[in-house]
């Protein structure tokens, strides 16, 4: 939930104390809140973002925040309330941007910005799923009263006189009605109308500021210049070096990105039909491009996996009749899963499609086991297909049910984890669990029917050489496997020692593997921030920005460069900053390079600009979690720590962090040395002369910072009226000599006689995190290191070099990674516990489940070794894969344990029963495992968007 307010003319410190503090005191502790962060800037702007848990209801959260802000309003400055406080619920990342451009010089940036507001913005806001539409770098119309302080003083007027005249003569008022009841003898009533609010610059110029006793009149045009122009010039936006009105589209939480984007594009096609000649629009940035490309790649992988699984099944069963039975289970299970996804409210996204790809290799398992067992009985006992099927199902039904329910026992509990991690697990695990259950239903119903109808006894015809070689290899492998099993089973102590070594190896490798939350993806764009010396004007920043844009446009891999000059995601509104969003060409047009190589080249070239510092960043892996990829650390001034202590701590941390090779892209949000002019008011003298202290401050604010007076009507809308001194009167410290206030006796008193002005420095913006003044440290792990390692190093530096009154917290993606960091153990514990409890209930035994559980660590060791050898990280996807692997290992173990238990119950020897079960189940287990592995192979080899 985002909160925005403004206190024009106020410094960052004033905004922090007068606006941020009372609002945050009320907001703190809102139910479901994870953390809140705010920014107060020297432009008078205040913005706060309250981040809630994914389980929170966004509507209730926004209402709760709104109610709490109402409680804070009594402690806020009147001008802040007059300007309005907005509370909006939205997904925190942009879905897309729309740029209105024109090659006609009459359509300047002010016209484009207001055309977009009047004719485009409101229509887009009404699209279902759109949370907010922001006019970035807006140039909203306003009636600017450019006052001339020297002329006002010559006439004996002050800025308060101007404000009073505007408030008196530019107002809406009801004039009454002729013939309103109770009256008699009238047939009609007539409303009385009059000129209320003014609507043109000419009308404002004619406002009477003072009528003199001699009959002369001083009008507004005598002491000020009036013009209709932009309300603010603090930021500006553009596309590819040209001025443009840039609209940022934000979704409502929970809305479907693809659907919202499609509706926005359709709406823009209709709206653009009414554009004036010479005006057009572009959509340079569209997050759904990455989403659709990723899903397209997954669809390809899905098809490739299906082909490979069918091929493996055919080579294993060696008959098109037998192959048809497991293959039929795939579409039935997947189509059924789609139905349940609809019931659960899931969408087709990367996680659910990943679940479906993995499910392809699993849903054939049960049917393969049925077919293989039926064919084995037909061959060894010479039974008819019907009799063989009947006998096979008598022995298999309970095992099939047990294996499927064990898989569900693995997946379902994990889906109840909280937070973002639980949300990621939930869609994946439930998708697989449903597909597995449906495949079991197919294996228990349709597969036996098909076996009895289409399978044929072996005709004795010699098989082709490929099948013979496969069978020969399988027989040899089975024979060697049984030989190893027979020898190993005679040495239980050695076996348990080896098992202990497996556990130790898992523990060691788990500690050595670097951790992260999610792998970094090429999302098709990156951001560049230009930082000029503090106090630089927008004109100076614009020159450097234009130069950088021209350079980036020459890059063959760049499609668009979108710029917002005068703003930065790290520090907010600041004329010495510029943010460039570099949108790359489609992935297929840059296959011979990577986004990292492109960024390295850009960073190297832009660092040659002596006028500025350059920071490059990739977007966060999960849109909206943080301002960029990498880590986001909050250094907090706690206890009695001052802003100066925080600056010193941030400098210390940055000093040691920049020495570490594991870290890169380090930057701090602190702006501590911004040039400022301090006016030291002589309060005794002010009181002696009878000058209201409020007039001293309001005069200075109105002339140098602008003051909002009231509103006027135009284009069926309401716009604001501002007073500010003309540019030549607010360029230098000496201009304050021309600012006058009235003493109690009516004499005009210059402000310079009431205080001294001197240059100093102070913060340009003040950030707060959970009510503490904070410095945001951004950075990322260097090539070859993980985000988890980078975060550990930052925490280590903080522990060793920062004082006790400086606290450390994480936000954005780093917060979620830290929260999920200890969940691997929890996930595996849940999995093992539920498998054990389920099997104990299934077999009514505490010992039988142990046989299944003992096989699981061996499978987990293979996963850990694979990740370690390939240089991968322990992230959410690894944990998902580990859960999947444990489930499959348990399923395979049950096939052996179930058969062995039946033989033991029938009087068989324990050891021989186990060996016989392993021999009999070797082929189906090998076939199903091979089908699953090859089903995943296309995912392993995939490239392009979403492949990480």
Language-model features: where?
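Signature of alpha-helical transmembrane segments and their immediate interfacial
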Residues: 396, 465-519, 919
